[in-house]
């Protein structure tokens, strides 16, 4: 290792738009943050990531949420409002990776947040889609948020 590389992490300079919730996706993007990536997490209002409500809670903060979302910047938007979707799409133009774990592709497709839609303005985009049950299985419509 060169002296100039000392302290540098493998994902330094990598920008990630985090559209994940609960555990599986949030764990992946937390590891990216630990490896130096700049993570912007966009949560769905009014409560944000449902993981915020999981025990143990102290001083109105969930230990689960803090553990799996440390090192990230976060904002909360109403994904049913067009102006909120435009903010997310604008963020997606300037990132290297978009991460999501909704399981059901139509949730993001109907909002224009799927890979095909986002790559129109960011052709080099890497789209990380975490699906517990896979996209081509009989259970592909079932939600799943745990580690895989």
How would you label these PLM feature ranges?
Residues 1-148:
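N-terminal helix-loop segment corresponding to the beta1-alpha1 unit
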């Amino acid at each position: 290792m060169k002296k100039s590389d000392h302290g540098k992490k493998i994902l330094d300079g990598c920008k990630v738009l985090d559209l994940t919730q609960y555990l599986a996706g949030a764990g992946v993007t937390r590891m990216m943050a630990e490896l130096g990536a700049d993570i912007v997490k966009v949560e769905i209002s009014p409560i944000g990531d449902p993981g915020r409500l999981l025990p143990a809670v102290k001083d109105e903060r969930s230990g689960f949420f803090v553990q799996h979302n440390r090192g990230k910047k976060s904002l909360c938007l109403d994904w049913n409002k067009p102006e909120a979707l435009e903010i997310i799409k604008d963020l997606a133009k300037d990132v290297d990776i978009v991460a999501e774990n909704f399981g059901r592709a139509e949730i993001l497709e109907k909002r224009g947040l799927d890979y095909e839609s986002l790559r129109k303005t960011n052709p080099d985009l890497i789209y990380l889609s975490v699906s517990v049950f896979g996209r081509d299985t009989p259970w592909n419509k079932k939600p799943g948020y745990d580690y895989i």
